[in-house]
Regions:
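Glycine-rich phosphate-binding loops that contact phosphosugars or nucleotide phosphates
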Residues: 89-209, 213-223
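A short, charged, Gly/Pro-tolerant segment at domain boundaries
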Residues: 224-243
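HTH-adjacent hinge/linker in prokaryotic transcriptional regulators
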Residues: 1-82
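Juxtamembrane helix-loop transition sites at the ends of transmembrane segments
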Residues: 30, 36-39, 122, 165, ...
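A short, basic/flexible loop-to-alpha-helix module at the beginning of a structural domain
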Residues: 82-89
Length: 243
């Protein structure tokens, strides 16, 4: 067993201010080394070529179901209760909550926006035809947080958004596929889940599960404090039959 003080002394000997900076440097170096391989694998056209022969030789329903189940298991195996509780506390304790997603991840962001709006005040999405995420985060502070959802091929805009939030001292809750994700170096709390697929697109079923599970932890944390808000929403939506 190595003591915490020994680890800190070692990282400072290497020229880092502490273990966290050392950890970020290791993640960044690993990511840069792996990206050339990851990029080749995640290009949709190349993934399609690799997957066609496998799909031809197997039952598509059974194969895809098995793949989704493996991804769901990855959420449970990689993240424990403490990870979800910490992420929930960071979100609930922040003044403003910004949701950062792009492209295919936007479907997760839309659902997350809906659920968090019902649970907490001051929840904002950062995608808008007239504004980009940088415009939305230009006045973010250390009292705020972002919830970023990013998977291969990681969006450069998502990366810049997390960097911007980090520079402002804001908390960053990241849902991604692995701890070596380019955005992970800036994250306060990471939740990892696999999006592996046997075809050309990422599978987001397990990501949706992870997001819903996170919202369940937030709901439990908030308790009955959201009851009045939910009743108010239902009161007016009932008038137009929108549920």
């Amino acid at each position: 067993h190595v003591s915490d003080s020994s680890v800190i002394r070692f990282t400072r000997t290497l020229g880092y201010s502490g273990f966290m900076e050392f950890q970020r440097a290791i993640r960044k170096a690993y990511t840069e080394r792996m990206n050339s391989v990851s990029d080749n694998i995640t290009i949709p056209s190349e993934r399609l070529k690799l997957s066609i022969s496998k799909l031809d030789q197997s039952d598509i329903v059974e194969s895809y179901f098995s793949n989704v189940m493996q991804n769901l298991n990855s959420c449970i195996n990689r993240n424990d209760t403490i990870d979800f509780e910490r992420a929930a506390s960071l979100i609930a304790g922040s003044k403003r909550k910004f949701i950062v997603t792009s492209r295919a991840n936007s479907c997760i962001g839309d659902m997350l926006l809906l659920l968090l709006k019902h649970l907490l005040p001051d929840v904002y999405e950062t995608s808008h035809p007239a504004l980009n995420v940088i415009d939305h985060l230009c006045d973010i502070t250390e009292n705020d947080c972002i919830v970023a959802v990013s998977f291969p091929r990681y969006s450069e805009m998502d990366f810049l958004a997390t960097q911007m939030a980090y520079d402002a001292g804001a908390k960053i809750i990241l849902i991604t596929d692995k701890a070596s994700s380019p955005l992970a170096q800036y994250a306060t709390q990471i939740l990892t889940v696999s999006v592996d697929s046997n075809t050309f697109f990422n599978s987001y079923v397990a990501v949706l599960f992870t997001m819903e599970l996170l919202c369940s932890f937030i709901s439990k944390k908030m308790g009955y404090s959201t009851e009045a808000k939910l009743e108010l929403i239902d009161k007016y939506l009932s008038k137009v039959g929108l549920f």
